[in-house]
Every structure is written in structure tokens, then in C-alpha cells.
């Protein structure tokens, strides 16, 4: 119920318009020495203009690259100092390892959801809640498919209404141990603007596995893999 309520509120807020968004993206591409593909550009623009967005894609499709782009552009467009950026942007993940990876790629602090909500181990309660909400304005959650419905509900309770929320993950990943296939369910609800990343970039030792997974996902498996 809390999740549905928050989605409804965010969808009814006025969208943000940035006059210089296209120019700023081109400048960022130069600065980072990269060229975003069409899906990535769509993901970045949607995240900055919509109030709630889902970005989904398999391993190696550039989700972390997009998160870095969103945070940099948000800082530039809102003229935030590094200190202000750490106060306005919250990068969250279900595990410490995923949070560390987020922090390393963006140069911003990242937290596990439990830490962000100030979980009290003794009482099993969150100090950040509907009565004492978090102050951040841009919240990006990575590995969303790993979060169960109860934890996401608690997180949504602790967030203010006038925010931008970006849910990132792989909807084909194994679901959370707890209840609900939350990312898949949210995508299937069609209530949230969703951008799907289709291009595979990462080609390391696991490139065969990634390519195979991608072909199975897209139902384009060729005889070369059999």
C-alpha cells in the first residue's frame, strides 16, 4: 500500500524541465570521454525529468555508467557544490558490496538501505520513517530486484513526496529472498516510466556468460551457443 501511494504521489507531481539538458549531456560526454547510446540517453533524460523512473538491463549494459551520468548532471543542472551534492543525493543498495561499487563509480557516499533508514538492531525498527523523513531530493536505488516488498515499503515511508526516485536493476535477476518480485511487478504494472537497456558493453572473462544470458533473455539464441 505504501509503495502504491508513493508512486501515485510522484506520478502526479509536475515534471522537471531543464533548458540546457541536451547541451549539458554533450558536455558530460566530452568530460567523461564516452558516448551514450540511445537507451542510455533516454534513461538519463527520463530520470532527470520524471519524478519516478525504472532503469532495467542485464549485466554489462551500462547501468553504473548511467547512474554516474545522472548524479553528475543533477549536480551541474542544480549548481550544487560537492558538499551540497552529498546532502541532496542518496545512493542506496541492498548490500554493502553494491553500495561500495556505487560510491566508487560516482565519488559520492552510498549506503545500504538499512543504514540509510538508521535501522535499530535491538528494536528492529527504522529511525527514518513516516514521522522523521530523509531530507535528500534525488534517491537512486541500485539492485532493486534484490529488495523485498517489506523493505521497499519501509524505505518509501521514509522518503519525502517532492523527490526524484530512480529504481535501477535487472528484472531477470533472481528475486529477493524476502516476499515479492518487486522490480518485475513494478515494471509489469506500467505505472512507472521504464527504460530498458539492450546493448551489452562489458566484455571480460564472463563475456560468454553475459552474451548467452542476453540471447536467452531476448529469445535470440543462435546455434553457435548450442
Where are these regions (language model features)?
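Pre-Walker A (Motif I) flank of P-loop NTPase domains
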Residues: 49-55
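N-terminal pre-P-loop "Q-motif" helix
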Residues: 33-49
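Conserved helicase motor core of P-loop NTPases
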Residues: 171-226
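Conserved P-loop NTPase motor core of helicases/translocases
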Residues: 78-93, 97-158, 199-200, 209-210, ...
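Interdomain "pre-motor" coupling segment immediately N-terminal to P-loop NTPase/helicase cores
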Residues: 1-21
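Conserved lysine of the Walker
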Residues: 63
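Walker A (P-loop) phosphate-binding loop of P-loop NTPases
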Residues: 60
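Hydrophobic positions on the alpha1 helix immediately C-terminal to the Walker A/P-loop
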Residues: 66, 70
